[in-house]
Amino acid sequence: MESMAKPFTDCNPNELEPTLNDLKAYVEQAARQGVAAHEAEAGIWHRVLQLGHQALGLLFSLVGSGDVGEIVELPNGQNVRRLEMSHPRVYQSVFGRFELERAVYGSREGQKIVYVPFDTQLRLPESDFSYLLQDWAQSFAIDQAYRRVPETLGRILDVHPSVDSLERMNLKMAETVRPFRESRPAPEPEDEGALCVVSADGKGIPMRRPAAEMPIQAHDREAASKTNRKKMAVVGTVYTIDPLVRTPEEVVASLFRSPDDHPPSAERPVPQHKRLWASLPHEQDGLEVSAIEQTFGWLAQEVARRNPEADKPILLVMDGQKSLWEAGQRDLPKEGTIEILDLLHATPRIWDAAHLLYGRDEEQGLHVVYDRVLRLLKGEVRSVIAGLRQMGTKRALRGKKRDKLAQICGYLENNAHRMHYDVYLAAGYPIASGVIEGACRHFVKDRMERSGMRWTIESAQAMLDVRSTSLNGDWDDFMRYRIEKETQRLYPYRALGESIDTLEESELSLAA
């Protein structure tokens, strides 16, 4: 029985020569005519893309249609028949679009296609978009709005994937992030710092209006404030770092340094192998899954991987959110975990107290803040609390001012056991959570909260997952892992594909 499938095109290696000659001629002409370098660069790039499209088309032609005979026996013993009609598919590469015709194998037309030799040999992706184009497109999408990506790719490659395609691509890519993360080996012990630092914080992400809600309801300010148009993502980070011993005076000097003063030039330890993760609450089997539980579950796993001998102090540095501290107490090791209140969440409250007590007297207020912060750094939190209460009584604060001061003192009192800053500084521990603050801003806000952006839980979680692989420095490894897993899933008979020989060896040669 004759093959009904036809090759992609009847091209041969020699057909690349005219394009190569055109490129050479263009460069020579540009040199003779004194063409500006940037104009020549654009002309060369245009011809390189043409050459790439032609070369990739040649690859498809040399592979042929994937016709390996009327009947193929699969490794499981099943015999499949070549179907009468060839089947088309689209392959959108960085060089442009291809429409491919392939021989396919199965039991009969209309039934499931079991084996496609052409796809198997070339390990094509499930979607129309090449793995390389997916890589490049998503590397743009994780940093800029989806609508900007087609513009960027169009300017560079003359390829314009739709926004819907990019969103689906991101959702599909995100499916592999969790298994990839779990497969990563722990850093080598000699590459780690002596301290294991853990931190978490929340950041709101704007959600799309529910489908059942009328557009006018979005203008109901009271209802909007009750339903909360944002969902809170809980961001977590783990890293190791070496100690940096400091005195309270050194810290307070850095906090009150004039903007014109240069910071101390001494080298500071650098966080090692910083890992970020973020989770949103979602429903699973009809039950609400907590974002805090998800994030702290991962933090606990990461700490166990990074501190397997439990020989590093685990420093949990956060703000005063009660639910986060409770999660840390539940999920992190009971032994060796030290809770530290981020100093920079205490200092604003000292400022608030100064304003309550001294009003607009900035000089006196600054003096009070300096004194109280220094005393906090010396471990005198109880004395600071007592002093603030005493001053509130002396100044006869009433009403809202009295209540506000009580809140400030209550916050400090509730976190006093996390404010032994004199001990932390002497041990070289960090006392501020700048890493997680920066993560919430860069990881979440810079991508998820741009003007007009609205997300679903699914789309937001997918973006956070894929974005985390880049921020963790794992992008290339993730892409390789994903392609390998997709190949295993899509092509269980790939060993057969590696032995396909639809052309004579002489035809496959690229020699002239």
Range-by-range predicted roles:
Residues 1-61, 104-512:
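Catalytic center-proximal scaffold of phosphoryl-transfer enzymes
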Residues 62-126:
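An N-terminal low-complexity regulatory-tail signal and nearby short nucleic-acid-interaction modules
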